[in-house]
Amino acid sequence: MKKDINIKTIKKVGIVAKSSPELVQNLKTIEKILSGYGVEILLESAVAKELNLNGYETGELARNCDFLISLGGDGTIISLCRQTAEISPFVLGIHAGRLGFLTDITMNECEKFFADFFSGKFEVEKPHMLDVFLHEKSGKTLQKIAFNDAVIVSAKSAAMTQIEACLNGKYFNYYFGDGVIIATPVGTTAYNMSANGPIIYPLSEVFTVTPICSHSLTQRPVVLPHDFEVKFKTSSDAMLVIDGQDRYKMSNLTAVSARLSDKSARLIRHVGRDYFQILKEKLHWGYND
């Protein structure tokens, strides 16, 4: 894992991108800007294939580049950070489409941003991810990583789930409803927010457990310290969904447990990026309708 970014020695930057009609033009724009700083662009294999070029696997890019660019939306950067969690590369999110919470730099801002970046005017945020443990009936435990959240929901449409929860090995709660969301601080502005969960400052060392449409009015979200572990069991026909990308049948597992991970993403940001201003703009806070 690279300890820091030395802007004077940056030679290679890898790009992972979501396919779009503007992809080729966006890549040309970024390449033109970075070539002016003597930086070589390397493409992830799926991106390179679209352009009939040679590319590199994501892990290879992460190990051999000074930092990575995620060109797309929040889903692209989430997938990239999950795939490279063991390597923990520096990642810059440039959005191509709807403005997200994670990819706050637009294509129109690239030239100005990189001028600031190569002048040393940037910050690195390190939001924690979530360790998710899948306890199989065979006795084997699989460890996965979540950037935003892990969600347990019914595998059948309009069906309820019954979920038992334990905290640090002690019985804690019994959820009866549409499911539960275990979210990182960054993930609290995703599905968690839609389920009326709390919004947590993204660099906090806590995580949340939020019931989805509980059948009891007394059920409320809880915010847990970083050293707590929560375990869930269910006899319902349910699914575990990690970041909306990976799905696992709960019927194949005895339990699922989660805790705040020691692993964190390393996101390159504008200097002075104001998280609460972003919340205000996206959630239309402070407006008198």
Curated annotation (Swiss-Prot):
Look up the record and give one Gene Ontology term from the biological process aspect.
Answer: NAD metabolic process
Pfam families in alphabetical order: NAD_kinase, NAD_kinase_C
Tell where it localizes.
Cytoplasm
Ligand binding (NAD(+)): D74, G75, N148, D149, D178, V186, T189, A190, Y191, N192, M193, S194, Q245
The protein's Enzyme Commission number: 2.7.1.23
Q: Which reaction does it catalyse?
A: NAD(+) + ATP = ADP + NADP(+) + H(+)
Which keywords does UniProt give here?
ATP-binding, Cytoplasm, Kinase, NAD, NADP, Nucleotide-binding, Transferase
Its main localization is cytoplasm
Q: Active site: which residues?
A: D74 (proton acceptor)
Q: Which GO terms describe its cellular component?
A: cytoplasm
GO MF terms here are:
ATP binding; metal ion binding; NAD binding; NAD+ kinase activity
Superkingdom is Bacteria
Q: Which InterPro entries match?
A: ATP-NAD_kinase_N, ATP-NAD_kinase_PpnK-typ_C, NAD/diacylglycerol_kinase_sf, NADK
Cofactor(s) needed, names only, are: a divalent metal cation
Main function: Involved in the regulation of the intracellular balance of NAD and NADP, and is a key enzyme in the biosynthesis of NADP. Catalyzes specifically the phosphorylation on 2'-hydroxyl of the adenosine moiety of NAD to yield NADP.
Family annotation (PANTHER family): NAD KINASE (PTHR20275:SF0)
Per the record, the similarity remark reads: Belongs to the NAD kinase family.
Q: What is this protein called?
A: NAD kinase
* Higher taxonomy: Bacteria, Pseudomonadati, Campylobacterota, Epsilonproteobacteria, Campylobacterales
Q: What gene name is given for the protein in this entry? A: nadK
